[in-house]
């Protein structure tokens, strides 16, 4: 059976529309305001590729009468039925939102379906942003599929004939229940007691891989069932791993990367660039509301149009379709002021569609995520590498090991600290470098014996120093990285590129015991008389026609959390040395993102997008603004 569907309307859709209307408040009528007169005129003006509406949200209440008796307690109308009528009247597609592995009602009725913690206890309920919302994370290996999800999916598809299904909440977990423990044992052959297994040094990495396989099986089962009921119904699950080994079920890639709560604009750009290597259509929902999940004292308010357009530009500049994500009025009616912003966003995208529909990456720099245990978003090292390379205007693609081929077009590959690099990929990397390619690696990537051999590293003592400094060649300001540094011993024609220097008073035990890391007089290098650490901070080796540079610390993971301009300065100097002539160079500030792409007609496009976050009042991390002033976010498009 064919498990994916080619849908031209997905590829040609530049703008989609999500109505975020949880059926979660049991003492308020649900859906009475979503009338033909309120909804259809807006849909006709917006002309979205599809409209996504809820059938079931995380609390488990359905927006239609289900045989499982899960419908909203004050359901005003059958919402999928209403929106099936509305979308047909507006000549657009209907996509159904369905909460996958979070279901409050299922967890209440079937406690044995709930996920377990690593300590062997069922995961408790989460109340989210309301005392009346109860969510439970559900184990994908439980009877939840057979006795719950498959029943509701059949109801949805047979009764409402949707054009697509968008699944949320498959990102929860991992689950450590006996079912999932048994799967881990089957995958690894481990036979020790659970108490011993979870203390193994390789437990976290192996469990991550096993859990990825479990959830991949869940998504495959989900999509196969959808296709068995309606072969042309497209499927996606939001915010899932973009590794190719898990790509098969997806008809399109998608995510709800809402800012400023969990995601920055850089995060949206990163996932669009990763999705862009997957040969499937992709979109991202940008929310018109400051969704204050982490700060219950802050009232959610509508964003300015400038901010919404800025987010939309990040998606569009990287080849994605823009999903406008709106919250309706409490009774389900679309809010006129928000719809005016939606229409303005639609016009903004429509005026530029030829610049990104059918476009592709210029493919000149790529970040390689080779560790199969990495997180959904690339892990700290992958995320930090993108943050740094985007700040240096490298417009990086993100690939996994399957993207390392003889035909890959990249001038430069960056291997951020990766705990695992398989020998076959390492061999392809060596072939790439010998043919003239450039490779920058860092930190734990030296776990690979093949990479050590390529670099000419004879011995390595991992994590030998907890702090270190580099004196730059083009700046009088040193770069300090308070992360573990590896002490490497070189052989052959490998060269030290930068020596490592110690912090002043680095081994004073009383200082280490009493001073917090943020104390201003802590972790300084003596710039006039720096103390050598006796080992390199960075090494290099020419290999065939190409060159490898390795940074002996986990700089990308550290840059992800800190974003130090000194770290970025060192990375800029290293890249300028490694690649003195590059395809594109700009003196734009680091917060101006460059996306270098090819239009469908072959034109080379350089999109410049302002990534300045503005004043994100609901973000747990506050931003420093120049002169304390919020400036309008503008996007500039250049051919």
Task: Please place each PLM-identified region on the residue numbering.
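Carbohydrate-binding surfaces of carbohydrate-active enzymes
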Residues: 2-6, 11-13, 42, 83-86, ...
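N-terminal structural segment of carbohydrate-active enzymes
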Residues: 2-61, 90-92
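Short acidic, glycine/proline-enriched helix-loop-strand junctions
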Residues: 6, 62-85, 90-92, 173-193, ...
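Active-site mouth loops of central-metabolism enzymes
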Residues: 21-35, 134-148, 295-305
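Stable alpha-helical elements in mature extracytoplasmic
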Residues: 35-39, 76-83, 145, 149-152, ...
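Aromatic-lined carbohydrate-binding/catalytic grooves of carbohydrate-active enzymes
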Residues: 39-40, 44-81, 102-127, 131, ...
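Proline-aspartate-enriched helix->loop->beta-strand connector
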Residues: 48, 161-165, 170, 231
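Active-site-adjacent "subsite" loops/lids of carbohydrate-active enzymes
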Residues: 96-160, 169, 192-208, 217-221
């Amino acid at each position: 059976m064919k498990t994916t569907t080619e849908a031209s309307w997905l590829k040609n859709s530049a703008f989609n529309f999500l109505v975020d209307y949880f059926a979660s408040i049991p003492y308020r009528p649900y859906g009475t305001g979503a009338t033909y007169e309120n909804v259809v005129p807006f849909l006709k003006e917006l002309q979205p590729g599809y409209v996504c509406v809820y059938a079931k949200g995380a609390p488990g209440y359905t927006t239609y009468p289900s045989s499982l008796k899960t419908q909203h307690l004050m359901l005003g109308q059958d919402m999928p039925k209403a929106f099936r009528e509305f979308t047909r009247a507006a000549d657009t597609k209907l996509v159904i939102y369905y909460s996958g592995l979070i279901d409050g009602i299922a967890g209440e009725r079937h406690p044995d379906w709930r996920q377990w913690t690593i300590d062997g206890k069922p995961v408790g309920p989460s109340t989210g942003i309301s005392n009346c919302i109860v969510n439970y994370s559900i184990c994908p290996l439980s009877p939840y599929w057979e006795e719950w999800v498959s029943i509701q999916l059949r109801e949805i598809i047979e009764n409402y004939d949707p054009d697509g299904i968008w699944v949320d909440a498959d990102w929860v977990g991992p689950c450590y229940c006996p079912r999932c423990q048994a799967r881990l044992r089957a995958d690894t052959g481990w036979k020790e007691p659970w108490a011993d297994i979870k203390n193994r040094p390789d437990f976290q990495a192996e469990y991550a891989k096993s859990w990825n396989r479990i959830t991949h099986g869940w998504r495959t089962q989900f999509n196969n069932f959808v296709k068995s009921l309606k072969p042309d119904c497209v499927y996606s699950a939001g915010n899932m791993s973009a590794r190719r080994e898990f790509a098969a079920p997806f008809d399109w890639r998608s995510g709800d990367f809402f800012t400023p709560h969990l995601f920055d604009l850089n995060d949206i750009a990163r996932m669009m660039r990763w999705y862009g290597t997957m040969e499937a259509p992709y979109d991202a929902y940008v929310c018109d509301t400051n969704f204050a999940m982490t700060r219950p004292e802050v009232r959610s308010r509508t964003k300015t149009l400038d901010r919404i357009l800025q987010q939309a530009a990040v998606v569009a500049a990287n080849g994605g379709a823009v999903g406008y994500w709106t919250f309706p009025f409490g009774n389900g009616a679309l809010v006129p002021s928000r719809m005016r912003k939606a229409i303005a966003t639609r016009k903004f995208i429509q005026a530029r569609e030829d610049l990104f529909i059918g476009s592709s990456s210029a493919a000149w720099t790529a970040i390689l995520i080779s560790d199969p245990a990495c997180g959904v978003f690339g892990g700290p090292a992958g995320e930090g590498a993108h943050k740094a390379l985007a700040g240096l205007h490298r417009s990086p693609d993100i690939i996994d090991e399957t993207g390392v081929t003889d035909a890959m077009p990249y001038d430069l590959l960056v291997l951020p600290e990766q705990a695992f690099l398989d020998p076959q990929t390492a061999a392809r990397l060596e072939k790439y470098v010998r043919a003239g390619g450039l490779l920058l690696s860092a930190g734990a990537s030296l776990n690979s014996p093949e990479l050590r051999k390529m670099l000419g590293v004879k011995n390595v003592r991992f994590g030998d120093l907890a702090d270190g400094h580099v004196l730059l060649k083009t700046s009088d300001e040193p770069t300090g990285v308070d992360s573990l540094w590896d002490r490497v011993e070189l052989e052959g024609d490998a060269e030290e590129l930068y020596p490592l220097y110690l912090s002043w008073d680095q081994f004073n035990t009383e200082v280490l015991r009493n001073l917090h890391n943020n104390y201003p007089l802590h972790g300084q290098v003596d710039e006039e008389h720096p103390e050598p650490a006796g080992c390199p901070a960075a090494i290099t080796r020419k290999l065939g026609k190409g060159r490898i540079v390795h940074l002996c610390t986990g700089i990308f993971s550290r840059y992800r959390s800190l974003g130090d301009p000194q770290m970025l300065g060192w990375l800029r100097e290293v890249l300028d040395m490694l690649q003195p002539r590059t395809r594109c160079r700009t003196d734009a500030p680091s917060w101006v993102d460059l996306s270098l792409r090819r239009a469908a007609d072959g034109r080379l496009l350089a999109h410049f997008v302002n990534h300045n976050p503005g004043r994100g009042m609901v973000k747990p991390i506050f931003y420093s603004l120049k002169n304390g002033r919020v400036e309008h976010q503008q996007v500039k498009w250049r051919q």
